[in-house]
Structures are given as structure tokens and as C-alpha cells.
């Protein structure tokens, strides 16, 4: 196969000794070297079948989550678009893993195959940074809902979601290029992801506190406030409810992403045996590429509006597959009844004909 169009850029295939030497010299870890080392190993048929099965299951779960979020009315449309973008960008990992499989199966030259790993690493780290910054985008959207309090719900303002998603895509792509070109190492990546997750959680708490404080003040003094309107009260209630629902999801997703970053490099830094590293890499790689099995159920379960949509459609589907049938229980009668004969209907019909015959009418006259 010819992959020259992918070999514009390439990455160096590092060995375990090189990764450890670089770690001891600089006190930091080159994540791209770790990625190429893990990708340049032998893989089993079991691993191939397992990951592809989990990929199909993850795609199914992802589209269920997107459907539930799209059908929900809470939170605002812009927040739902941001969450959906974070879920759908997971498809980059499917492409990334496909490049790794082609690299492991291909018999082409080293240059063309290393080009495949470059694009695989770029897509992998772009998704990772995009997922982390999605937490900050959700917080920024709630901040805009707090600033534009008077008419945020009545106007779509799709440009807010478009700007946040576009900025997230470009910033994450910049970080991914820096990581692949070895301009930022493991410590820098970890600091960026941790800082973004912590800042998102803190800002979301501040936004929740401000909206909650203003809503309480509005409820206590609604008769005396001159600028009191029902739309402002509704928007404050919406902001408080959305922030309350998003807080646990942001914490869980942020902790999960940071855990994945650490799990990639720790087995090599701690110098585990090759067999242990192989199993650690299999578990980590499978978890990364099938994270919708963790993230999507977490978001749907922790956010009440998404959970209600899912349960509603689940009950509807269950009713269509297995409709509820009311069992009719007939008790045995205490009166003996004989079974009707086959000619019983004919006898009654003849009696009726005789009763309306012309002779019977003449007698009555």
C-alpha cells in the first residue's frame, strides 16, 4: 500500500530504553515517544477483535447519547450543541486507531508507516485536548447566559456555540501539533489539562453562586423590585438548575480525562516488565478509545433532563417490543350449560320464518 500522502510528516519510533533515558535526563516524558513505542509492538487477534467490538458498541452508545441530548429541552440549545460536539469528536479516535492498525499490518517502508503514526497521534491528542476544553466551553456558555440574562432563552444566539466550538477546535489543534512536534512534554500537557479542569469547576461554582444569590433575592423582594420580570426569574432558575446538573458531570469527566493522561506514561516510567506494560497498554488503550462507554452514560445519568428523555424512549420501545396484554380470567360457572348443537341455529331460523309466514298472519286477522 502507498501512504505517501500521509508521510508528509513522520514521527520517530522510540524504544523503551530511549524513553527511559530521556525521562532520566530531562525529568519529563515525551508523550509521542510513548505513543510510538506502544504502537510499534506486536498485537494479538484477541486485541483486534475486542477493540473493534467495543468500537461498535461505543458508536451505538454515542449516537444514543446524542439523540437524548438533542431531544432534551434543558439546558439551553447552545450548551447542548457544545456537549454534542464533544461526543461526536470521539470519532477522531476511531480514525486514529484505524491508522495504528494499518501501521501494524502494513509491510511498507518505515517512512510511510511512521507518517501514519504522526496522523494517529495528532488525532488522538486533538481529541484529548478538545475534550478537556469542552468543560471550559460549557462554563463559558453558562457565563454568557448569566450576562445576557434578560433575553437569553428567547433568542437562539447560535453564534455563541459556534464561536466556542470553533475556538476549542483550533486551540486543541494547536496543542496537538505542539505535542506531536515535541514542543510540550508530559508535565506541560498534564498541567494544561489539570488547570483547565480545575478552572472550569471553580468558574461553574462561581456562576452557580451568583445566579443562586440573585434568584433568592428576587424571590424575597419580587414585589418591591422595579425591574422584576418573569423572563429574568425563569432564566435565573434555568441557570441555577443547569449549573447544579452540570457540576457532577464536569467533575467526573475532568477526573476521567486526567486519569487517562497519567495511565499512559506511568507503566513505562515505573519500568514495569514487558508483559505488565503490554496488559497496561491494552487496558489503557481500550479505555481511551471506548471512553463513550464511560462518558456518555455518566452525562446522561447525572443530568436529569437527558435521563428523562432516555427513560421515556426506552419505555416506548419496550412497550412496542412487548406490549402489555390484560389477561382475561374466566371463572367456571355454577350453572350447567350444554354446548350448542350444529343445527341449533337453523332450528331458530325456521321458527322465525313460521312466525312471520302468511298463514300465521291470516289466522291473526
UniProtKB/Swiss-Prot annotation:
Principal localization?
membrane
Q: Which InterPro entries match?
A: 7TM_GPCR_serpentine_rcpt_Sre (IPR004151)
Q: Which UniProt keywords apply?
A: Membrane, Transmembrane, Transmembrane helix
* Statement: the UniProt record of this protein carries the keyword Transmembrane helix: yes
Location in the cell reads:
Membrane
Tell me where on the tree of life, at the top rank, the source sits.
Eukaryota
What sections of the protein cross the membrane? 49-69, 82-102, 116-136, 158-178, 189-209, 250-270, 292-314
Kindly provide the name given to this protein in its UniProt entry. Answer: Serpentine receptor class epsilon-21
Membrane topology of the entry: Multi-pass membrane protein
Species, as recorded: Caenorhabditis elegans
Q: Which GO terms describe its cellular component?
A: membrane
- GO biological process terms, semicolon-separated: sensory perception of chemical stimulus
- Spell out the Pfam families in the cross-references: Sre
Q: Which family does it belong to?
A: Belongs to the nematode receptor-like protein sre family.
